[in-house]
Regions:
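A solvent-exposed, charged loop/short amphipathic helix patch at secondary-structure junctions
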Residues: 108-115, 119-123, 271-299
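Short acidic (Asp/Glu) and glycine-rich catalytic loops that position anionic groups and cofactors
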Residues: 133, 289-292, 343-347
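Active-site mouth of glycoside hydrolases
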Residues: 1-217, 223, 231, 251, ...
Length: 412
Protein backbone atom coordinates (compact mmCIF):
# COMPACT_ATOMS: atom_id res chain seq x y z
CA UNK A 1 0.00 0.00 0.00
CA UNK A 2 1.00 3.65 -0.42
CA UNK A 3 2.64 5.59 2.40
CA UNK A 4 0.28 7.54 4.65
CA UNK A 5 1.20 11.17 3.93
CA UNK A 6 2.04 13.64 6.67
CA UNK A 7 2.82 17.27 6.03
CA UNK A 8 1.99 20.91 6.64
CA UNK A 9 0.34 23.87 5.00
CA UNK A 10 2.89 26.61 4.53
CA UNK A 11 3.16 30.34 4.88
CA UNK A 12 6.41 31.78 6.32
CA UNK A 13 6.18 33.07 9.86
CA UNK A 14 7.68 36.48 8.96
CA UNK A 15 5.41 37.29 6.01
CA UNK A 16 2.37 34.95 6.15
CA UNK A 17 -0.02 35.73 3.27
CA UNK A 18 2.35 38.46 2.07
CA UNK A 19 4.96 35.85 1.10
CA UNK A 20 4.95 36.58 -2.63
CA UNK A 21 5.36 40.33 -2.06
CA UNK A 22 8.24 39.76 0.39
CA UNK A 23 9.66 36.61 -1.14
CA UNK A 24 12.57 35.34 0.98
CA UNK A 25 14.03 32.16 -0.48
CA UNK A 26 16.51 31.86 2.37
CA UNK A 27 13.73 31.69 4.96
CA UNK A 28 11.82 29.22 2.82
CA UNK A 29 14.83 26.92 2.42
CA UNK A 30 15.48 27.02 6.15
CA UNK A 31 11.85 26.13 6.86
CA UNK A 32 11.82 23.28 4.34
CA UNK A 33 14.91 21.74 5.96
CA UNK A 34 13.21 21.89 9.36
CA UNK A 35 9.99 20.36 8.02
CA UNK A 36 11.99 17.51 6.53
CA UNK A 37 13.88 17.15 9.80
CA UNK A 38 10.60 16.38 11.58
CA UNK A 39 10.06 13.45 9.22
CA UNK A 40 7.22 15.13 7.33
CA UNK A 41 6.90 14.53 3.62
CA UNK A 42 4.71 17.09 1.87
CA UNK A 43 4.12 20.85 1.82
CA UNK A 44 0.95 22.51 0.55
CA UNK A 45 1.43 26.14 -0.46
CA UNK A 46 -0.66 28.86 -2.08
CA UNK A 47 -0.35 31.04 -5.18
CA UNK A 48 -1.72 34.53 -4.60
CA UNK A 49 -4.06 35.18 -7.53
CA UNK A 50 -3.66 38.95 -7.22
CA UNK A 51 0.15 38.70 -7.36
CA UNK A 52 0.37 36.13 -10.14
CA UNK A 53 -2.30 37.69 -12.38
CA UNK A 54 -2.05 41.51 -12.21
CA UNK A 55 -4.33 41.79 -15.24
CA UNK A 56 -6.82 39.42 -16.78
CA UNK A 57 -4.52 38.40 -19.65
CA UNK A 58 -1.13 38.63 -17.91
CA UNK A 59 0.74 36.23 -15.64
CA UNK A 60 3.60 37.92 -13.79
CA UNK A 61 6.98 36.50 -14.85
CA UNK A 62 8.69 37.39 -11.57
CA UNK A 63 6.01 35.53 -9.62
CA UNK A 64 6.41 32.53 -11.93
CA UNK A 65 10.15 32.59 -11.24
CA UNK A 66 9.51 32.68 -7.50
CA UNK A 67 7.10 29.76 -7.91
CA UNK A 68 9.84 27.76 -9.61
CA UNK A 69 12.25 28.68 -6.82
CA UNK A 70 9.68 27.55 -4.25
CA UNK A 71 9.28 24.18 -5.98
CA UNK A 72 13.05 23.88 -6.09
CA UNK A 73 13.42 24.60 -2.38
CA UNK A 74 10.80 21.99 -1.54
CA UNK A 75 12.40 19.41 -3.82
CA UNK A 76 15.93 20.15 -2.60
CA UNK A 77 14.78 19.40 0.95
CA UNK A 78 13.47 15.99 -0.15
CA UNK A 79 9.83 17.00 0.21
CA UNK A 80 6.82 16.82 -2.11
CA UNK A 81 4.83 19.91 -3.14
CA UNK A 82 1.11 20.57 -3.49
CA UNK A 83 0.64 24.03 -5.06
CA UNK A 84 -2.80 25.58 -4.58
CA UNK A 85 -3.99 27.86 -7.38
CA UNK A 86 -6.34 30.86 -7.43
CA UNK A 87 -5.81 31.89 -3.82
CA UNK A 88 -8.34 33.23 -3.36
CA UNK A 89 -9.88 32.54 -0.01
CA UNK A 90 -7.46 32.45 2.91
CA UNK A 91 -7.96 32.82 6.66
CA UNK A 92 -11.28 34.62 6.48
CA UNK A 93 -10.40 37.02 3.65
CA UNK A 94 -10.99 36.79 -0.10
CA UNK A 95 -7.77 38.04 -1.72
CA UNK A 96 -8.69 38.81 -5.32
CA UNK A 97 -7.45 40.62 -8.42
CA UNK A 98 -9.41 43.82 -9.00
CA UNK A 99 -10.27 42.70 -12.54
CA UNK A 100 -12.11 39.63 -11.17
CA UNK A 101 -14.60 41.65 -9.13
CA UNK A 102 -18.23 42.20 -10.08
CA UNK A 103 -19.73 45.58 -9.11
CA UNK A 104 -23.14 43.91 -8.99
CA UNK A 105 -21.92 41.43 -6.35
CA UNK A 106 -21.39 42.60 -2.74
CA UNK A 107 -18.48 40.94 -0.97
CA UNK A 108 -20.71 38.96 1.39
CA UNK A 109 -19.58 37.65 4.78
CA UNK A 110 -15.90 37.52 3.83
CA UNK A 111 -14.24 40.84 3.11
CA UNK A 112 -12.45 41.34 -0.19
CA UNK A 113 -8.88 42.61 -0.39
CA UNK A 114 -7.81 43.61 -3.92
CA UNK A 115 -4.51 45.29 -4.68
CA UNK A 116 -3.86 45.66 -0.96
CA UNK A 117 -7.10 47.57 -0.29
CA UNK A 118 -10.57 46.60 0.91
CA UNK A 119 -13.27 46.43 -1.76
CA UNK A 120 -17.06 46.37 -1.35
CA UNK A 121 -17.34 43.89 -4.24
CA UNK A 122 -17.15 40.15 -4.55
CA UNK A 123 -15.88 38.00 -7.39
CA UNK A 124 -17.85 37.39 -10.56
CA UNK A 125 -19.10 33.93 -11.50
CA UNK A 126 -15.77 32.15 -11.89
CA UNK A 127 -17.52 28.79 -12.29
CA UNK A 128 -19.53 29.65 -15.40
CA UNK A 129 -18.56 33.12 -16.62
CA UNK A 130 -16.48 32.70 -19.77
CA UNK A 131 -14.29 35.73 -19.09
CA UNK A 132 -13.16 34.46 -15.69
CA UNK A 133 -12.93 30.85 -16.85
CA UNK A 134 -10.55 31.86 -19.64
CA UNK A 135 -8.42 33.81 -17.15
CA UNK A 136 -8.22 30.77 -14.86
CA UNK A 137 -7.25 28.53 -17.77
CA UNK A 138 -4.45 30.95 -18.67
CA UNK A 139 -3.18 30.89 -15.09
CA UNK A 140 -3.35 27.07 -14.94
CA UNK A 141 -1.53 26.64 -18.26
CA UNK A 142 1.24 29.11 -17.45
CA UNK A 143 1.90 27.68 -14.00
CA UNK A 144 1.62 24.16 -15.39
CA UNK A 145 4.19 24.99 -18.07
CA UNK A 146 6.65 26.14 -15.41
CA UNK A 147 6.25 23.05 -13.25
CA UNK A 148 5.45 20.42 -15.88
CA UNK A 149 6.44 17.17 -14.18
CA UNK A 150 8.84 18.58 -11.62
CA UNK A 151 10.10 15.71 -9.44
CA UNK A 152 8.80 17.42 -6.28
CA UNK A 153 5.27 17.95 -7.65
CA UNK A 154 2.82 15.68 -5.83
CA UNK A 155 -0.48 17.19 -7.00
CA UNK A 156 -2.24 20.39 -8.03
CA UNK A 157 -4.96 21.91 -5.85
CA UNK A 158 -7.47 24.02 -7.82
CA UNK A 159 -8.32 26.31 -4.94
CA UNK A 160 -8.46 26.79 -1.21
CA UNK A 161 -12.04 26.58 0.08
CA UNK A 162 -13.11 28.09 -3.23
CA UNK A 163 -16.81 28.04 -2.37
CA UNK A 164 -16.08 30.80 0.16
CA UNK A 165 -15.27 33.08 -2.78
CA UNK A 166 -18.67 32.48 -4.29
CA UNK A 167 -21.08 29.57 -4.32
CA UNK A 168 -21.94 28.11 -7.73
CA UNK A 169 -25.46 28.56 -9.05
CA UNK A 170 -25.82 24.81 -9.56
CA UNK A 171 -23.73 21.66 -9.02
CA UNK A 172 -23.32 21.33 -12.80
CA UNK A 173 -21.47 24.67 -12.91
CA UNK A 174 -19.01 23.54 -10.25
CA UNK A 175 -18.48 20.21 -12.01
CA UNK A 176 -17.83 21.89 -15.36
CA UNK A 177 -15.36 24.33 -13.73
CA UNK A 178 -13.49 21.44 -12.11
CA UNK A 179 -13.33 19.46 -15.35
CA UNK A 180 -12.20 22.40 -17.46
CA UNK A 181 -9.37 23.46 -15.16
CA UNK A 182 -8.21 19.89 -14.61
CA UNK A 183 -7.95 19.53 -18.38
CA UNK A 184 -6.01 22.81 -18.64
CA UNK A 185 -3.44 21.61 -16.12
CA UNK A 186 -3.14 18.23 -17.81
CA UNK A 187 -2.14 19.92 -21.08
CA UNK A 188 1.32 20.49 -19.60
CA UNK A 189 1.53 18.38 -16.45
CA UNK A 190 0.58 14.81 -15.67
CA UNK A 191 0.47 15.47 -11.92
CA UNK A 192 -2.80 14.56 -10.18
CA UNK A 193 -5.39 17.29 -9.59
CA UNK A 194 -7.72 17.86 -6.65
CA UNK A 195 -9.33 20.90 -4.98
CA UNK A 196 -9.79 22.21 -1.45
CA UNK A 197 -13.30 21.40 -0.31
CA UNK A 198 -14.08 22.06 3.34
CA UNK A 199 -16.47 21.37 6.17
CA UNK A 200 -19.04 24.02 5.24
CA UNK A 201 -19.47 22.32 1.86
CA UNK A 202 -20.92 19.40 3.81
CA UNK A 203 -22.81 21.37 6.48
CA UNK A 204 -25.36 22.90 4.10
CA UNK A 205 -26.21 22.72 0.42
CA UNK A 206 -23.76 25.10 -1.27
CA UNK A 207 -24.60 23.76 -4.74
CA UNK A 208 -21.59 21.43 -4.81
CA UNK A 209 -21.87 17.67 -5.15
CA UNK A 210 -18.75 15.62 -4.42
CA UNK A 211 -19.79 12.96 -6.93
CA UNK A 212 -19.63 15.41 -9.84
CA UNK A 213 -17.04 18.01 -8.85
CA UNK A 214 -14.51 15.33 -7.86
CA UNK A 215 -15.05 13.18 -10.95
CA UNK A 216 -11.87 14.36 -12.77
CA UNK A 217 -9.72 14.38 -9.62
CA UNK A 218 -7.26 11.69 -8.69
CA UNK A 219 -8.42 11.98 -5.08
CA UNK A 220 -10.62 14.28 -3.02
CA UNK A 221 -9.56 16.56 -0.19
CA UNK A 222 -11.30 17.91 2.89
CA UNK A 223 -10.63 20.59 5.52
CA UNK A 224 -12.13 20.57 9.00
CA UNK A 225 -11.72 22.04 12.46
CA UNK A 226 -13.79 21.33 15.59
CA UNK A 227 -13.65 25.03 16.58
CA UNK A 228 -15.36 25.97 13.30
CA UNK A 229 -17.88 23.10 13.08
CA UNK A 230 -21.41 23.82 14.29
CA UNK A 231 -22.05 20.11 15.00
CA UNK A 232 -18.82 19.57 16.97
CA UNK A 233 -19.01 18.28 20.54
CA UNK A 234 -16.29 20.72 21.57
CA UNK A 235 -12.87 22.11 20.70
CA UNK A 236 -11.13 18.79 21.54
CA UNK A 237 -13.51 16.65 19.46
CA UNK A 238 -11.25 14.32 17.47
CA UNK A 239 -14.10 12.73 15.50
CA UNK A 240 -15.14 15.83 13.51
CA UNK A 241 -12.26 15.44 11.06
CA UNK A 242 -12.65 11.71 10.29
CA UNK A 243 -16.42 12.15 10.00
CA UNK A 244 -16.04 14.87 7.37
CA UNK A 245 -13.46 12.73 5.60
CA UNK A 246 -15.75 9.71 5.48
CA UNK A 247 -18.73 11.76 4.28
CA UNK A 248 -16.58 13.13 1.45
CA UNK A 249 -15.26 9.66 0.67
CA UNK A 250 -18.80 8.26 0.62
CA UNK A 251 -20.24 10.99 -1.60
CA UNK A 252 -17.32 11.34 -4.03
CA UNK A 253 -16.38 7.65 -4.24
CA UNK A 254 -12.77 8.88 -4.06
CA UNK A 255 -10.04 8.38 -1.49
CA UNK A 256 -9.53 11.50 0.63
CA UNK A 257 -6.44 13.43 1.66
CA UNK A 258 -7.29 15.54 4.71
CA UNK A 259 -5.37 18.57 3.54
CA UNK A 260 -6.19 20.95 6.42
CA UNK A 261 -6.69 20.17 10.07
CA UNK A 262 -5.61 21.89 13.26
CA UNK A 263 -6.79 24.40 15.86
CA UNK A 264 -5.57 27.73 17.25
CA UNK A 265 -3.19 27.59 20.21
CA UNK A 266 -3.99 29.50 23.39
CA UNK A 267 -1.51 32.27 24.23
CA UNK A 268 0.83 31.34 27.12
CA UNK A 269 -0.82 31.10 30.56
CA UNK A 270 -4.35 31.38 29.18
CA UNK A 271 -7.23 28.93 28.84
CA UNK A 272 -9.98 28.62 26.26
CA UNK A 273 -13.16 30.52 27.12
CA UNK A 274 -15.26 28.85 24.41
CA UNK A 275 -15.57 25.74 22.28
CA UNK A 276 -16.13 27.58 18.98
CA UNK A 277 -14.66 30.43 16.97
CA UNK A 278 -17.54 32.38 15.36
CA UNK A 279 -17.27 32.49 11.58
CA UNK A 280 -17.49 35.83 9.75
CA UNK A 281 -21.09 36.99 9.74
CA UNK A 282 -21.98 35.08 12.91
CA UNK A 283 -22.77 36.98 16.14
CA UNK A 284 -20.06 37.00 18.82
CA UNK A 285 -20.34 34.39 21.54
CA UNK A 286 -21.86 35.57 24.85
CA UNK A 287 -19.14 36.71 27.22
CA UNK A 288 -20.63 35.37 30.45
CA UNK A 289 -18.41 34.91 33.50
CA UNK A 290 -14.93 34.15 32.18
CA UNK A 291 -11.84 33.20 34.18
CA UNK A 292 -9.26 35.98 34.56
CA UNK A 293 -6.80 34.07 32.37
CA UNK A 294 -9.28 33.46 29.53
CA UNK A 295 -7.96 33.76 25.99
CA UNK A 296 -9.81 35.99 23.54
CA UNK A 297 -10.94 33.04 21.39
CA UNK A 298 -11.54 29.29 21.46
CA UNK A 299 -8.19 27.53 21.56
CA UNK A 300 -6.17 24.56 22.77
CA UNK A 301 -3.23 24.76 25.14
CA UNK A 302 0.05 23.52 23.70
CA UNK A 303 -0.28 20.25 25.64
CA UNK A 304 -3.89 19.78 24.50
CA UNK A 305 -2.86 20.45 20.91
CA UNK A 306 -0.20 17.75 20.93
CA UNK A 307 -2.66 15.18 22.27
CA UNK A 308 -5.36 16.28 19.83
CA UNK A 309 -3.00 16.10 16.84
CA UNK A 310 -1.94 12.53 17.49
CA UNK A 311 -5.49 11.39 18.25
CA UNK A 312 -7.11 12.99 15.20
CA UNK A 313 -4.45 11.89 12.72
CA UNK A 314 -4.58 8.38 14.16
CA UNK A 315 -8.30 8.34 13.37
CA UNK A 316 -7.76 9.72 9.85
CA UNK A 317 -5.32 6.88 9.23
CA UNK A 318 -7.48 4.17 10.81
CA UNK A 319 -10.53 5.22 8.76
CA UNK A 320 -8.90 5.06 5.37
CA UNK A 321 -7.43 8.53 4.77
CA UNK A 322 -4.56 9.07 2.35
CA UNK A 323 -2.84 11.41 4.77
CA UNK A 324 -3.10 14.58 6.84
CA UNK A 325 -1.62 18.06 6.35
CA UNK A 326 -1.53 20.21 9.47
CA UNK A 327 -2.63 23.83 9.44
CA UNK A 328 -0.08 25.23 9.62
CA UNK A 329 3.71 25.48 9.76
CA UNK A 330 4.17 28.61 11.87
CA UNK A 331 2.65 31.13 14.20
CA UNK A 332 3.10 34.50 12.51
CA UNK A 333 5.23 37.44 13.54
CA UNK A 334 3.43 39.82 15.91
CA UNK A 335 4.33 42.68 13.54
CA UNK A 336 1.66 41.31 11.16
CA UNK A 337 -1.13 41.61 13.74
CA UNK A 338 -2.47 44.91 12.36
CA UNK A 339 -2.70 43.61 8.77
CA UNK A 340 -5.50 41.53 7.21
CA UNK A 341 -6.58 38.92 8.10
CA UNK A 342 -5.15 39.19 11.60
CA UNK A 343 -6.55 42.65 12.35
CA UNK A 344 -9.99 41.05 12.68
CA UNK A 345 -8.96 37.48 13.51
CA UNK A 346 -6.16 37.35 16.08
CA UNK A 347 -6.56 33.59 16.47
CA UNK A 348 -5.23 33.17 12.91
CA UNK A 349 -1.78 34.13 14.23
CA UNK A 350 -1.55 31.00 16.38
CA UNK A 351 -2.16 27.81 14.35
CA UNK A 352 1.49 26.84 13.82
CA UNK A 353 3.61 23.91 14.92
CA UNK A 354 6.41 26.40 15.56
CA UNK A 355 6.06 29.57 17.62
CA UNK A 356 6.66 32.96 16.06
CA UNK A 357 10.22 32.89 17.42
CA UNK A 358 10.84 29.68 15.47
CA UNK A 359 10.89 27.31 18.45
CA UNK A 360 9.02 24.02 18.19
CA UNK A 361 5.71 23.49 19.97
CA UNK A 362 4.82 20.09 21.45
CA UNK A 363 2.50 19.51 18.47
CA UNK A 364 5.60 19.36 16.26
CA UNK A 365 6.90 16.44 18.32
CA UNK A 366 3.49 14.76 18.06
CA UNK A 367 3.67 14.96 14.26
CA UNK A 368 7.27 13.75 14.35
CA UNK A 369 6.22 10.76 16.44
CA UNK A 370 3.44 9.94 13.99
CA UNK A 371 5.85 10.26 11.04
CA UNK A 372 8.36 7.92 12.70
CA UNK A 373 5.74 5.15 12.68
CA UNK A 374 5.88 5.06 8.86
CA UNK A 375 2.27 4.04 8.42
CA UNK A 376 0.73 2.82 5.18
CA UNK A 377 -2.67 3.76 3.77
CA UNK A 378 -5.37 1.34 4.88
CA UNK A 379 -8.30 0.09 2.76
CA UNK A 380 -11.26 2.45 2.63
CA UNK A 381 -14.16 1.52 4.92
CA UNK A 382 -17.71 1.15 3.57
CA UNK A 383 -19.69 4.30 2.78
CA UNK A 384 -21.43 5.89 5.76
CA UNK A 385 -23.96 8.02 3.81
CA UNK A 386 -25.61 8.18 0.41
CA UNK A 387 -25.04 11.53 -1.31
CA UNK A 388 -28.66 12.13 -2.35
CA UNK A 389 -30.09 11.38 1.08
CA UNK A 390 -27.33 13.27 2.86
CA UNK A 391 -27.85 16.53 0.93
CA UNK A 392 -31.62 16.20 1.13
CA UNK A 393 -31.33 16.18 4.94
CA UNK A 394 -29.25 19.37 5.23
CA UNK A 395 -28.82 21.56 7.13
CA UNK A 396 -30.36 19.81 10.14
CA UNK A 397 -29.43 16.26 9.17
CA UNK A 398 -25.71 16.59 9.83
CA UNK A 399 -26.30 16.71 13.59
CA UNK A 400 -28.12 13.37 13.48
CA UNK A 401 -25.59 11.79 11.13
CA UNK A 402 -22.69 12.90 13.31
CA UNK A 403 -24.23 11.66 16.56
CA UNK A 404 -24.94 8.30 14.95
CA UNK A 405 -21.37 8.20 13.61
CA UNK A 406 -19.90 8.86 17.06
CA UNK A 407 -22.12 6.20 18.63
CA UNK A 408 -20.88 3.66 16.07
CA UNK A 409 -17.27 4.51 16.91
CA UNK A 410 -18.00 3.96 20.60
CA UNK A 411 -19.95 0.72 20.26
CA UNK A 412 -18.00 -0.73 17.33
Amino acid sequence: MADFLLGVNYWPRRSAMYMWERFDLGEIREDMARIKGLGLGIVRFFLSWDTFAPSIDTIDTRALGDFEAMLGAIGDAGLQAMPTLFCGHMSGVNWLPAWSLDPATPHGRFRTIAGGAASPYGIGDFYAGERLLAAQELFARRVGERARDHPALYAWDLGNEFSNLREPRAPADAAAWSSRLTSALHETSEAPVTAGTHGEDLERDRHLRPSSIARPWAFATMHGYPVYSAFSRGRLDADVVPFLMQVMQSCSDKRVLFSELGNPTCPPDTVSPYDRVPLPGEPPLPAGALPPNAAAYACLTEAEMADYAYAVIDRVHARGGLGALWWCWADYDAALATLPPFDRAQHELHFGIVRNDGSLKPVAQALQRMASEQRSVLPAPPAIVSEAAYYASLPSGIEHDYRRYCQRQTTG
